[in-house]
């Protein structure tokens, strides 16, 4: 076995297979309290936010979320699928009961499940943006979990592929591409809805990037 640090007061312990020295399982051990979090027999440990750990089975992706910010671990939920991202109050999982939806959004307070077609996490703020299968765009605050944006997106009918980019301050970008991955439209959304769209512009845009925020929304 070996260990590495990743969470305050917690060690990530690893057990190795003798044959090939591959990692067989991981667990978390609190050096102050002696608490041991083992998960499944083949669990892997990963971070899912500040002070939030996920123990996930390597075989069937069953996952357990723990909040490690206090003196003791607090279990946030157990899931039958892999955890992709977490923000206080909700989690995005791989897979869905809907065969046409690749992800599921779960409200941890109510247990409500929502089919999701795309999601993204902003590396600056930790904000999480999800686009549901019925084209509702939601942006959650990465620190508090507050719902910053909850608006209906305006899909482009000709689009075959959609991508979502989460931005600070509750903003998000949607990009629609055709079957050849050529950009058809880029849209910017905030809490008040659609702020800007390249559809109908004389110039064709293929890329947009967040620079800073203004009183009228993000400056791209």
Range-by-range predicted roles:
Residues 4-17, 41-51, 78-89, 116-127, ...:
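Repeated scaffold domains used in trafficking and secretory/extracellular systems
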Residues 1-7, 25-41, 61-78, 99-118, ...:
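Surface-exposed loop/turn elements that mediate protein-protein interactions on large endomembrane-trafficking
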Residues 101-104, 157, 170, 220:
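Intrinsically disordered, low-complexity segments enriched in proline/serine/threonine
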Residues 1-15, 28-34, 55, 86, ...:
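Short intrinsically disordered, low-complexity coil segments enriched in acidic
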Residues 12, 18, 23-27, 54-64, ...:
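Beta-strand C-termini and the immediately following turn/loop, strongest in propeller blades
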């Amino acid at each position: 076995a070996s260990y590495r640090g990743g969470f305050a007061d917690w060690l990530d312990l690893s057990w190795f297979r003798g044959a090939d020295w591959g990692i067989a399982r991981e667990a978390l051990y609190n050096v102050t309290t002696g608490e041991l979090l083992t998960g499944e027999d083949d669990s892997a440990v990963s971070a899912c936010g500040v002070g939030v750990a996920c123990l996930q089975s390597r075989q069937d992706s069953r996952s357990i979320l723990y909040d490690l910010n206090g003196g003791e671990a607090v279990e946030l939920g157990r899931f039958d699928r892999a955890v992709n991202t977490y923000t206080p109050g909700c989690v995005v999982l791989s897979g869905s009961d809907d065969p046409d939806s690749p992800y599921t959004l779960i409200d941890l307070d109510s247990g409500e499940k929502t089919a999701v077609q795309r999601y993204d996490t902003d590396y600056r703020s930790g904000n999480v943006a999800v686009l549901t299968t019925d084209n509702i765009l939601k942006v959650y605050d990465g620190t508090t979990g507050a719902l910053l944006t909850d608006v209906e997106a305006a899909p482009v009918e000709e689009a075959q592929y959609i991508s979502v980019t989460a931005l600070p301050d509750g903003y998000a970008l949607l990009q629609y591409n055709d079957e050849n991955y050529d950009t058809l439209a880029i849209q910017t959304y905030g809490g008040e809805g659609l702020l800007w769209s390249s559809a109908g512009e004389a110039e064709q845009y293929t890329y947009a990037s967040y620079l800073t925020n203004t009183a009228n929304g993000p400056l791209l």
